[in-house]
Structures are given as C-alpha cells and as structure tokens.
A protein has these predicted regions:
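Compact, charge-rich alpha-helical regulatory domains located at protein termini
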Residues: 218-249
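Extracellular adhesion/carbohydrate-binding repeat motifs centered on closely spaced tryptophans
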Residues: 1-215, 224-226
Length: 249
C-alpha cells in the first residue's frame, strides 16, 4: 500500500490520515510487522497501523509497546499497576533477574514478586520494592536470617550465637532443646546458657556455672570436674554478662 497526499505526492515516513499512525518506507511502501525507526522498534499490524500501550507476542516472548509505540527495552514498566521488566532485547523477564546489582523474581506472567515467596522449595523475602533480601531482616516483629543466595535459614545456628527454628524465626526469651542440649536465649536472641543435666559441658561452651552460688568454673579450676553445671558458657565474659563470677581456684 502507498499513500499520496492532497497534492498527489507519494508520502514517506510517519503519517496519520485516520487517527492511526503508519510508517511508509523511503520507497513509500506501508510497513507491517516489526520495524526499527530512528533507533526504536515499533510494531505495525496487518493494516499498517502502529500498535501502542499493549503487549505483543513474538517468538514465544512478550514485548511491550509504550504509549509512543516504541518498544520498551532495558527498563521497568508498569502498564497495569504491576511491575514488569523488559530486558535489553525488549523481552519480558520471568524468573530470577539481577538488575542494577539487586536480584528480583518475576512470575510466569512477568509480574514482579514482592514479600514472602516460596520458590523451588525455599522461602525468600522480597522487599516492598521487590529486591531479594539477605542477612538479618525483621519482618512482622520477628527476626529472620537469609543466606547469601536469599534462601531463608531454618534450624540453624547463625554467627554461633543466634538460632533460627524450623519456621525461620530467631529464638528469643525462651529455652529450647537443640540436639539434646537445653539452651536459654535472652531478649536479643543471644544464647546465654546451655545445659544437658549432666556433669559435662560441650567443648564449645566449657565454662560451668553454678546457679545457686552464681560462680563459674573454667577448665583446670580445682573444683571443675566435680561441679555439676546448671549452665554452660563459651567465655567468661558471657558468664559474667549472665551474672556469674569467676571461681577463685
């Protein structure tokens, strides 16, 4: 198809004779399908009309044409109140994608995920802006720890001091049996005592504390072997923070 203006001259470039936009090549032929014009990609339907503010499928992938008709590429878009990301080729992203140093997850329909998400069997927390979180995060009043890959840690010691249970929440102000040992955690989640009811303490917490006297005994102290601990500590500083004093011998 060709277009001739009122003077009978053949039209080229952009024209809008009926409220729709068309693009005519240098030889005047009407463009259909995909075309690159002035550095941007556009899509023209079978009638030659430029499509805009809509998704177009091509080769099994989806592309978004903005209000100007130009294909979105390498940018965030929100055509319907949800967030999507068009990669540098213009294709709608699904699955995990690293953008400007942060990781995001996009559902199969391209919508950016946020908040709690279970993905491939693991739990992740994607903040209000959708970015994957790592490390400690306080969510809904509880503390959670997310590994470097973003997966929430469960039933695991963190930094040798804190413990997250099977729900992922850090234990606070409670006593819990873990691997046969009774641990007491303070209001900040730090474990302050550990005991199994016997005469021994674990190798990583060898200091014995006597609850009635508030005295702690280090390995090598005279009464260490005959002391039955009510509490075990990893360091003297930890014992003293719990109100215990060092034995004199």
């Amino acid at each position: 198809w060709f277009h001739f203006n009122d003077n009978g001259a053949m039209s080229t470039g952009w024209i809008s004779p009926n409220g729709h936009w068309y693009y005519l090549s240098d030889n005047g032929a009407m463009t259909t399908g995909w075309a690159r014009v002035d550095g941007s990609w556009y899509y023209f339907d079978t009638t030659g009309a430029m499509r805009s503010s809509t998704w177009v499928s091509n080769g099994g992938q989806w592309f978004y044409l903005e209000g100007s008709g130009a294909m979105a590429a390498g940018k965030w878009i929100s055509p319907d109140g949800h967030w999507y990301y068009a990669d540098r080729t213009g294709a709608m992203v699904t699955g995990w994608k690293q953008i400007d140093g942060a990781w995001y997850f996009f559902h199969g329909n391209g919508v950016m995920a946020s908040g709690w998400q279970q993905i491939s069997g693991a739990w992740y927390y994607l903040g209000g802006n959708g970015a994957m979180t790592t490390g400690w995060q306080q969510i809904g009043g509880a503390w959670y720890y997310f590994n470097s890959d973003g997966a929430m840690a469960t039933k695991k010691w963190i930094e040798g001091t804190f413990y997250v249970d099977d729900s992922g929440a850090m234990l606070v102000s409670t006593t819990r049996t873990i691997d046969g040992w009774n641990y007491t955690f303070d209001g900040n989640g730090r474990w302050i005592t550990v005991n199994n009811g016997g005469y021994s303490c674990p190798a990583w917490a060898p200091i014995k504390g006597n609850a009635s006297s508030k005295i702690y005994h280090r390995p090598g102290n005279q009464s260490y072997d005959i002391t039955k601990p009510e509490a075990c500590f990893s360091t003297g500083t930890q014992a003293e923070a719990a109100g215990y004093h060092a034995a004199k011998r």
